[in-house]
Structure formats: C-alpha cells, structure tokens
C-alpha cells in the first residue's frame, strides 16, 4: 500500500505509559521510570516495519517519539529524513504537522550525545590529548549523533571565533565574536555554540566544554554577528582538592553548530 503514495511518514519509538498490568508488571512500557534497557534500538519489530515500508517507497520520513535516545544506524544511513520528536505532548501532532508541511523550519539541537550502540558506552570525554586511541574492531569510533547536532530546511555557515584579545590576564571579560550566515533558500534559526578546550591543565579536563550559545534567526542570505562575553569563571575548574582554580595557560576557543569536530572552527588564546 505504501508504494501508492508520494511520501510516507512512519512513527516509531517507545511507550512510557503504564496501562497494561499483569502480576504487577507493565509489559507494554518500554521507557521511563524503572525501565532500564540493555540496547539503544527500537523495541519489538519496529525496525523491520521501517525496512519493509522502505522497500516499497524510498520517499520515507521516520519520526521518533521517545523519552530516551534511539540509536538505529540503518535508519540513519538509509532514510532521507528523521525527526526526533521526543515526547511532544498532546499538541505534538499539530506541531509535527507544521514541520513536515514546511510551515515551521525545525531548529532543534540534540541535548545529548547518542552512541551508535551500547558497546560505545561509557563514552569518555575527559581524556589526555597524548593518549593513544584504541579503535573498535567492528564499530565506528564516532557517535551516531553528537551533542548539539540538528538540521533544518536551510543551511548555515559560522565563522571562526574572533577574540577581543589573544593574550588575556583573566580580569574583566573576554569578548568572542563570530558571524553566522543563512546560506540556504529558506528563513530559519541556527544555534551558534561556543566551546573551549584547556590545552594544559593539572587535572584532565573534557576535550570540549560548552560555555555559551545563542540562537539566531536569519532570512536567506542574511548574516549576523554574535558576540559572547566570557569571564575567568568560564575557564576555571575544580582541581584534585576540589578547589575552584583559575589556572593560566593556553585555551582553544571553538565556534560551530554542534560539538562534532568537523563543524568547529577555532582560535587560541593564552
């Protein structure tokens, strides 16, 4: 039947409702409180359903409705468009309809990192830059979706960060500017994200730390300058004695539209 339509939308995901109880257990609930999972994929035969529909009609959009991350590499590799609606509430259907019919340009970003499989967990963010990285034998090293990732119906470019000074004593504030441009053909909004990396520190810090962000609405071809104001607190951390430390040194400042390395541009200050 799906072959007879110009485009097909299939809604899959998890169920967090408790409405079927047998012996004190909810067998239909697949997410939520007291429902730990040993895998990140779609429960049941939902992936088989998506594949069966895809065989009949390649113009397919998958909509995830879930309160947890869903990791299905096959869907990411084969389906043209994916919408993660999370748990949108009673008005979620109307909001989703506005998105799929182009009345709203989606601009959401992933609030978490989604691993490709449970074999990638736990993902380590605090590792030394000199540490040798071991690769998986049968799995990619990068996550399925990085933190801050999200597409829209238009495209954007974000310039490299431009600090107000490249040598800073930590007093006052450091202004960091970047320019974001709508390079597509539709009005939309982009979230400019600013990360830092401490090149040398007493304690091993995360490779990337989100310190500021701003969501900017742009018409096609329009550009806007975004300026972030950072204080010394943005570069400080807790040492091994749990004391908040403003340690001097070299820092890399990144700007981009997600935490993925390929989307980030940088500048170094000290």
Please identify what each model-predicted range represents.
Residues 1-270:
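C-terminal non-catalytic regions of proteins with extracellular/luminal or membrane-system context
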């Amino acid at each position: 039947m799906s072959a007879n339509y110009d485009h097909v939308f299939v809604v899959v995901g998890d169920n967090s409702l408790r409405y079927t109880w047998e012996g004190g257990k909810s067998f239909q609930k697949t997410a939520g409180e007291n429902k730990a999972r040993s895998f990140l994929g779609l429960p049941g035969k939902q992936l088989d359903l998506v594949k069966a529909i895809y065989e009949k009609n390649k113009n397919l959009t998958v909509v995830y409705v879930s309160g947890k991350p869903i990791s299905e590499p096959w869907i990411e590799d084969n389906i043209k468009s994916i919408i993660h609606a999370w748990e949108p509430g009673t008005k979620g259907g109307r909001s989703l309809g506005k998105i799929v019919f182009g009345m709203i340009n989606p601009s959401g970003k992933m609030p978490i990192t989604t691993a490709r499989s449970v074999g990638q967990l736990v993902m380590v963010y605090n590792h030394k830059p000199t540490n040798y990285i071991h690769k998986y034998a049968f799995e990619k090293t990068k996550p399925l979706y990085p933190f801050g990732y999200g597409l829209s119906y238009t495209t954007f470019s974000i310039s490299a960060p431009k600090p107000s000074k490249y040598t800073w004593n930590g007093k006052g504030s450091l202004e960091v500017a970047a320019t974001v441009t709508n390079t597509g053909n539709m009005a939309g909004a982009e979230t400019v994200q600013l990360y830092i990396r401490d090149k040398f520190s007493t304690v091993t810090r995360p490779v990337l730390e989100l310190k500021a962000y701003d969501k900017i609405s742009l018409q096609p071809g329009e550009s806007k300058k975004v300026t972030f104001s950072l204080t010394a607190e943005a570069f400080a951390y807790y040492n091994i004695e749990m004391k908040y430390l403003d340690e001097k040194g070299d820092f890399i400042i990144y700007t981009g539209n997600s935490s993925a390395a390929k989307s980030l541009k940088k500048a170094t200050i000290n």
